[in-house]
Amino acid sequence: MGLRRAVGPAIRSTGVALAAGLVMVLVALALGIGEVSRVHAALGAGTFGAIAMSALQITAAPNFGLWALSFAAGPGFQIADGASTTWSGSRGALMPLIPVFAGLPQPGDFPRYAALAVLIPLAIGAYAGHRAVGSIARLSSVRSKVEVALVTALLTAAALALLDLIGGGALGRAKLGNLGAPTGWFFLALLAELALGAVV
């Protein structure tokens, strides 16, 4: 019963998580709009090229949202080998000349309160738990409620990790051969945080 009841809430929670990730991306872009605009202008791509580049970045927006979620969850993400962003800070390296990446924080250590980003997946977990408990009878046992909440957290974390795995890739070889979130750690961190939020 727990699995069947958890599917609907997990789908909704996955959508909420993706939306939260996209909001984080938009906030980062707003804070770094000057640098993003500078890189965009430096490309000198012309009208058609600018449209194509914008379309490419919009298409990749769900990926960026997942990377932002991975940052909030703890594992962080990398754009290139040596260029990573985690709670501890941003590490610079050779970066692809893509405007949206200019919205990343400048290399350096982050303040300790950056770890408060974990409140985002915890809140998503709380939402997932609320939806999960609402999918079963009000008089169900506490055990049944906890079970469906945990299964919902598991399905949500698995769905997000699968989307990250499918959307991951490379922009070339060597330093650009791996980008995005570390899927395994992303899944484990999300599972723990969503589960905690779901049952609290």
Locations of the language-model features?
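N-terminal membrane-targeting/anchoring modules of bacterial envelope and secretion proteins
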Residues: 1-42, 47-51
